[in-house]
Amino acid sequence: RQWFAVQQTPTEPIRAVKLGGRLGCVSACRHHELWVPHDRDLHVAMNPGRALPVKPPAGVQFHRLSTPCATAVLPLEDAVAQVVQRHDVETGLIVLESAVNSGRLHPGDARHILKGLPARKARAAQFFSPLAESGSETRLRLFFQRRRIPVQPQARIPGVGRVDLLVGRSWIVEADSTAPHSARLDER
């Protein structure tokens, strides 16, 4: 099979195909314009039966696919599932919730991805929230949830409006900035 790239083709999918695979995992999620934590490596998904390099090039991580992929970039849902399965819980939830928040992944599909997790990661499902609007919110919410501190994402507070996180009964946390909420504050 031969591949052809037009001049506007981004470099990451081209590199992945030249390495014998497909753009996958975190790299594919970035290509699909999801918010992903900082990761400089190129993640290459290899079709079943394809040999993995004995010594991968520096800055490249290879992942084995269970079913073949015919495109140069893994479909969004498959790429998100790879991140959730292969990375730490925090990274997986950040990417999963980014996909849901962007409207590119239905919350039911996100829950389906979480159901497929191995037992050692299954607890992550209890922390999933379709309400997170940024990776920073997911990261902070998860920090409190892991410590069993009550936290409510996107809470509505009378006289204030919607806040990123309500921790306990009275602590308000704005994860990213006040910009999304400042218009409401200016009206008071």
Where are these regions (language model features)?
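Surface segments flanking catalytic/ligand-binding clefts of nucleic-acid enzymes
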Residues: 100-188
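Short gly/ser-rich loop at a beta-strand->alpha-helix junction or flexible surface loop bordering the NTP-binding
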Residues: 1-119
